[in-house]
């Protein structure tokens, strides 16, 4: 699910304004940053944790698989009905013609000779002459229809009831394998069925081809009115409408299984690409209320620069250290600070800005004690002196707040207004968005580099608390800890941190300009 920090700017909605000449890509940030090309995106559109896959919808890949499985169930029932309706004629053939030579009721020696040939050829062909037995072909078709019916029913039921098994990659791999096997078998069964219900399709070049063609040729040419027609012979030579429908449905089932394989592969790829928290298998409300629009967010930012928020009574250091600072001067109820340590310093004026994209920024806001003075996040000092690690004072280098610097927020805002005045055309809006995307990538790269140092310091701090002071692990971790602290105190680190502050202010200003222009257009 989404984990946007509190009061962070809402995602920009590309459907609010869509010029005809602009069609941003939806998956620009789907892969690695160094692989994907840099294309233009709407302002503040990059929230990878907010990209949700609604797999509960019928239009999603799993939903399409459910629809196709239903269609296969219906088509299997139709095939069973069509093929079963013609079995009676094959039973008649078996009882009257397999035993030997049978002629027509009348017609003289000519028809009698045809009757002998038909009785001999047809009876002999039911297993001895190399012909496909119509009864065997229809039985094969019915068996495959039954297997497809069972498989499609299992896929549909497991998907509709939303079982845990149907939400795994292994499940869709099984669907791919079963669909491929059944699709191939249905294709073979359909071809065999065509050969069985259409004897002329298999008689060319065979031993009894001329006899079968002579028997069935009378049904392919106009016959005289009133001529007696043997119904059994007619159904043997002519493809019935039910049989034609069964053939068409057989090929449609093959196409349906091919589509199931396609969407199952697509589902597996999406499950590999996105995290489980980004996939919704059940319909639910992600947000209780709609996020505020750009205008309200800008007003909140303006109001936040004037009023200092009320101090929290107790704040737990969630990122910088596992220790908690409370208003009464305790650190996890182990260390006490005198009252003069936080009442002797006057309250400085603090500019509080909202975080941009990184969820870690949520923990980087200035701290305030109950006495009203400003406190920066700091590492606690060790309970006792430890060799190899320098003492961490109250003003440690653990603060990662980018809202303080040599240049005030008002001065930065004036600079950005001169550089990025209000938008007056779509071309200018396109230029602003390209600048926003470029700045966003630079900001994310710098902030990721700074965050890595902070995370490593936090990890080493926890390890130092676990190791014995005399151990080699403790000394190695202490050396690395001190080295990273020197890195944080370097001019290069401070320059990057200040540059992140400027980039954040720039991106916020560009977003405001784009939002103002979009509201004017609407």
From Swiss-Prot:
Result of changing residue 402 to F: Loss of phosphorylation, decrease in binding to TJP1 and significant loss of regulation of TJP1 binding
Composition bias type Basic and acidic residues, residue spans: 391-400
Annotated PROSITE patterns: MARVEL, OCEL
Impact reported for residue 398 to A: Loss of phosphorylation and loss of regulation of TJP1 binding
GO terms under biological process: bicellular tight junction assembly; cell-cell junction organization; epithelial cell migration; maintenance of blood-brain barrier; negative regulation of gene expression; positive regulation of blood-brain barrier permeability; positive regulation of D-glucose import; positive regulation of gene expression
Membrane topology: Multi-pass membrane protein
A cellular-component GO term for this protein: endocytic vesicle
Phosphoserine PTM sites in chain numbering: 302, 313, 321, 340, 369-370, 408, 490
Domain MARVEL: 60-269
Compositional bias per record (Polar residues), positions renumbered to this chain: 367-376
Tissue specificity comment: Localized at tight junctions of both epithelial and endothelial cells. Highly expressed in kidney. Not detected in testis.
Cytoplasmic topological intervals: 1-66, 161-170, 266-522
Membrane topology (Extracellular): 90-135, 196-243
Membrane-spanning ranges: 67-89, 136-160, 171-195, 244-265
Gene Ontology molecular function terms on file: protein domain specific binding
Sites of Phosphotyrosine modification: 368, 398, 402
UniProt remark on domains: The C-terminal is cytoplasmic and is important for interaction with ZO-1. Sufficient for the tight junction localization. Involved in the regulation of the permeability barrier function of the tight junction. The first extracellular loop participates in an adhesive interaction.
Known partners and oligomeric status: Interacts with TJP1/ZO1. Interacts with VAPA. Interacts with CLDN1, CLDN6, CLDN9, CLDN11, CLDN12 and CLDN17. Interacts with PLSCR1. Interacts with LSR, ILDR1 and ILDR2. Interacts with TJP2/ZO2.
Disease: Pseudo-TORCH syndrome 1: An autosomal recessive neurologic disorder with characteristic clinical and neuroradiologic features that mimic intrauterine TORCH infection in the absence of evidence of infection. Affected individuals have congenital microcephaly, intracranial calcifications, and severe developmental delay.
The name this protein goes by in its record: Occludin
Organism this protein belongs to: Homo sapiens (Human)
